[in-house]
From Swiss-Prot:
Assembly mode: Interacts with, and is activated by, tap-1.
Protein name: Mitogen-activated protein kinase kinase kinase mom-4
Start-end of Polar residues biased regions: 352-369, 396-411
InterPro entries reported in the protein's UniProt record: Kinase-like_dom_sf (IPR011009), Prot_kinase_dom (IPR000719), Protein_kinase_ATP_BS (IPR017441), Ser-Thr/Tyr_kinase_cat_dom (IPR001245)
Top-level division of the source organism's lineage: Eukaryota
Biased composition (Low complexity): 1-21
Gene3D superfamilies: Transferase(Phosphotransferase) domain 1 (1.10.510.10)
Role of this protein: Part of the Wnt signaling pathway essential for the specification of the mesodermal cell fate in early embryos. Stimulates the wrm-1/lit-1-dependent phosphorylation of pop-1 and plays a role in the initial nuclear accumulation of wrm-1.
Length: 545
């Protein structure tokens, strides 16, 4: 496929420059939100005759606009090829243009969706024309197309492709901030993966404390609104790696968005354990470590996945269709889903309104692998549990494992490939034990957490689910959660004051009895003193007589 872009500059920008007065000189460039993101590069505008509007049809519609499948050609002398056009609503046009600038700057990378240019349509307004990925998203493959079998070789290949793209961002001091399965598009019969959706992409010199991203893959420090860096993308890689191996949802889908975020940020909630090779589990656990310093870098991830891809080299073998026992074919074009686009649907938990009734129990995924086929292990799934795992119950454990005839030395090399030289194996996802002298503080913290979770379950106090790509929505969500935390502090203080009051009232009769005894003692001492005084007087009178 020919992907060379237009070199023709924007006609509108040319006309603007010819009629605009010369700008006043400035002393220093002002850093804006787009600083460092291809500010000097012009994205070509695609003329109308290069788009086949008669054969365009809608793929999806969301809050931010619509996506259409169309046909695109470089010029009248070229053949049409499949393409996608992403149109934006007027209020999100700036985000779309900014995303286009990022994609244009990264267009040479083989694992980043390619952009052909900007296109203005009379019906939908400004849009971005990009290559069409005919196999949908990784999320659709993992969750919706369970009849398609893939192997650990394919997982290694996909993760290598993702790490290669992420390493390119990080080398340029840039962060994606919303890595997830929905933003990983597939083509070439599911074997080639490309990243898309750069609406939250930013440069590292910006102040990064806003909680942007998707809740399932959002790093703890992002939700805590702490300063974060490229290591937030590494956390997302760890969750994505788990999803590919387990082929299941990492958390209970009945868990509310605030409850999920709060538990991830404060209680070190992570996806359930999988019975898989430690070569894999050790690495994705290191990626989602609560301490960003303990996570590997993108370069170390790329090194690890390169070694994994070398160990499992059959990633180019066609995926198998379990229904036909034949290599999988390219799926038919997707149809419009009124509920919204996959990439614009927000968190993927619940609806866009109030969160559903919160549940703090997790469904345990059950990853099972079939027998080894062609030196690879096919990933399949048992049916999901029909009910949440209640406290005290033991969910069915994973029975399969990624195991192969590998030597211990090879396994050690793979395990160490992506691990930083200074990093050590981190503990499991369980919270560390509480010191004995800190149990009172721990009890107070647990009580505060319980109050906070109760606020998240209450219809009057729980926040509306945030829109992952809307800065105002995320800010409102964060402010609401912060207010709930402050409210929880106030309720806990009130509870402690009432507890102290009740304790004082319960001890009040004892206090009154104690006061009465003291008064009685004082009275008796005075009477004894009087008797002694009178006794002394009688003795002196007797002596005189």
């Amino acid at each position: 496929m020919d992907t060379s872009p237009h070199s023709k500059p924007s006609s509108s920008s040319a006309s603007q420059s010819s009629h605009s007065p010369s700008p006043a000189p400035v002393t220093a460039p002002r850093k804006t939100r787009d600083s460092g993101l291809c500010m000097t590069q012009d994205i070509p505008e695609i003329p109308t005759h290069c788009i086949d509007n008669l054969n365009s049809h809608q793929l999806g519609r969301g809050t931010y606009g619509i996506v259409e499948k169309t046909r695109y050609r470089r010029s009248r002398n070229h053949e049409y090829r499949p393409a996608a056009i992403k149109y934006s609503s007027p209020i999100h046009l700036a985000t779309l243009i900014r995303e286009a600038k990022v994609m244009w700057a990264l267009r040479d990378h083989s694992n980043i969706i390619k952009i052909y240019g900007l296109y203005r349509d009379a019906r939908h307004g400004q849009g971005v024309v990009m290559e069409y990925m005919d196999c949908g998203s990784m999320s659709e493959l993992i969750y919706d197309r369970k009849s398609i079998d893939y192997t650990i070789d394919h997982v290694a290949s996909w993760l290598y492709q993702m790490a290669s793209a992420v390493n390119t961002f990080h080398r340029n001091d840039q962060v994606h901030r919303d890595l997830k399965l929905q933003n990983m598009l597939l083509c070439d019969r599911y074997r080639t993966m490309k990243l898309c959706d750069f609406g939250t992409f930013t440069a590292m010199h910006q102040s990064m404390t806003s909680n942007r991203g998707t809740p399932i893959t959002m790093a703890p420090e992002v939700f805590r609104c702490e300063e974060y860096n490229q290591k937030s993308d590494i956390y997302s890689i760890g969750i994505i790696m788990w999803q590919m191996i387990a082929r299941n949802h990492p958390y209970n889908r009945n868990l509310s968005v605030p409850g999920l975020l709060y538990n991830v940020a404060t209680a070190s909630l992570r996806p359930p354990e999988l019975d898989c090779n430690p070569i894999l589990s050790d690495f994705y656990k290191q990626c989602w470590h609560d301490d960003p310093v303990s996570r590997p870098t993108a370069a170390e991830c790329l090194q690890y996945f390169t070694a994994l891809k070398t160990e499992y080299p059959n990633g180019n073998v066609p995926l198998a269709d379990a229904n036909t026992n034949r290599p999988v074919e390219t799926p038919p074009p997707r149809v419009h889903r009124p509920s919204g686009l996959g990439s614009a649907s927000g968190s993927g938990l619940g609806t866009n309104g109030r969160t559903p009734t919160a549940s703090n129990h997790l469904n345990a995924p059950q990853a099972v692998n079939t027998h080894r086929r062609n030196r690879s292990e096919t990933i399949q799934m048992k049916p999901e549990l029909p009910y949440p795992v209640m406290p005290g119950e033991v969910a069915a454990s994973s029975s399969g494992a990624f195991r192969g005839p590998r030597s211990q030395s090879e396994a050690k090399n793979l395990r160490d490939a992506g691990r930083s030289q200074s990093g050590q194996r981190h503990p499991h996802r369980n919270a560390p034990p509480i010191p004995i002298d800190d149990r009172r503080d721990s009890n107070e913290s647990n009580e505060k957490d319980a109050i906070f979770m109760e606020l998240l379950r209450n219809d009057d106090t729980r926040p509306v689910d945030p829109d992952a790509r809307d800065e105002a929505s995320l800010d409102i969500f964060h402010q609401h959660c912060s207010s709930n935390k402050e409210y929880a502090d106030a309720l806990l203080l009130k509870k402690e004051v009432l507890r102290a009051k009740h304790e004082l009232l319960s001890r009040w009769p004892q206090h009154q009895r104690h006061v009465e005894l003291l008064e009685r003692q004082n009275y008796l001492e005075q009477e004894i003193a009087k008797l002694e005084y009178n006794s002394d007087d009688d003795f002196s009178i007797t002596e005189r007589l």
